[in-house]
Swiss-Prot record:
GO CC terms: mitochondrial matrix; mitochondrion; plasma membrane
Cofactor or coenzyme needed: [4Fe-4S] cluster
Name the UniProt record assigns to this protein: Iron-sulfur cluster transfer protein NUBPL
Source organism (scientific name): Homo sapiens (Human)
Organelle targeting sequence: 1-38
Length: 319
């Protein structure tokens, strides 16, 4: 898929050598990146916003071929959400080889799945003009990172991001999947609301570290999903403990059992604890997630147990 195909597909932004960015808005080209829209572009944007608001909430429509959707979310960045999403997808496949698993990265501004899953290149288009996911380790993957250069920033306004999310949700040929794991961006913004309102989500997994500042945002994330009627399956307490590789002494660097206390407050359960371990970081950075590269390690087994707990809380696909 060439750059012009990608720009047309997403209505996105093309960066100029001078640092500006152009974006198609209703047939006009408007300068973004800190500059004011022209009069015509601004008026077009207002009309578009009015049209969207007049429709009310979108009607949920299942993703074709996908039985169940599991979103992995966090209230803030840097808590290991993407690492959890990638290893959860691999753990679901490892626990039951008969299941077909997909992984969708909807973090438009900071996609991590291509790096963690060791995938590069652009998706091919099917005869019906749908994008085909890239495949590695038995997992079908789609990400905004496949559609832009690795070092190229995505400099888009909200409506462009929403258009991109719509394409990622509706214009991908997943085939037949038992589980689609969705790596959400951090926070409780437009993307989270758009995904929650456009597709039926089977359940949400909230990732947090034990420290208070992360738990505050995790609380907000869980409440957001409840307000949009998405079942919260439970919390994952990441970076729960650090064990010295030499003396084996354990230290709770980010605090002890903060996620369990939050889970009690919310009436939820902790799906599992993931330790702070060098192996997890190195495996992710090299594009060989620990569930795949070191399946017998204690760290991989922690993800495998979490996958079991997630499936146990999911309704039957026929329900």
């Amino acid at each position: 898929m060439g750059i012009w195909q990608r720009l047309l597909l997403f209505g996105g932004v093309s960066l100029r050598a001078g640092g500006g960015a152009t974006a198609p808005l209703g047939g006009s080209r408007a300068m973004v990146c800190g500059r004011q829209l022209s009069g015509a572009g601004s008026e077009t944007l207002k009309q578009r916003r009015t049209q969207i608001m007049s429709r009310g909430l979108p009607k949920q429509k299942p993703i074709e071929g996908v039985k169940q959707v599991i979103v992995v979310a966090s209230g803030k960045g840097g808590v290991g959400k993407s690492t959890t999403a990638v290893n959860l997808a691999l753990a679901l496949a490892a626990n039951d080889s008969s299941k077909a698993i997909g992984l969708l990265d909807v973090d438009v501004y900071g996609p991590s799945v291509p790096k963690m899953m060791n995938l590069k290149g652009n998706p091919e288009l099917s005869q019906s003009n749908l994008m085909r996911p890239l495949l590695n380790y038995g997992i079908a993957c789609m990400s905004m990172g496949f559609l832009v250069e690795e070092s190229e920033p995505v400099v888009w306004r909200g409506l462009m991001v929403m258009s991109a999310i719509e394409k990622l949700l509706r214009q991908v040929d997943w085939g037949q999947l038992d589980y689609l794991v969705v790596d959400m961006p951090p926070g409780t913004g437009d993307v989270q609301l758009s995904v929650s309102q456009n597709i039926p989500i089977t359940g949400a997994v909230i990732v947090s570290t034990p420290q208070d500042i992360a738990l505050m945002d995790a609380h907000k994330g869980a409440e957001m999903f409840r307000r949009v009627h998405v079942p919260v399956l439970g919390l994952v307490q990441n970076m729960s403990v650090f064990q010295c590789p030499k003396c084996k002494h354990k230290t709770h660097i980010f605090g002890a059992d903060g996620a369990r206390k939050l889970a009690q407050t919310l009436g939820l359960e902790v799906l599992g604890d993931i330790p702070l371990h060098l192996n997890i970081r190195e495996a992710s950075d090299t594009g060989q997630p620990i569930v795949f590269s070191q399946p017998e390690s204690d760290e991989a087994k922690a993800y495998l147990r979490i996958a079991v707990e997630v499936v146990r809380r999911l309704p039957s696909p026929s329900e």
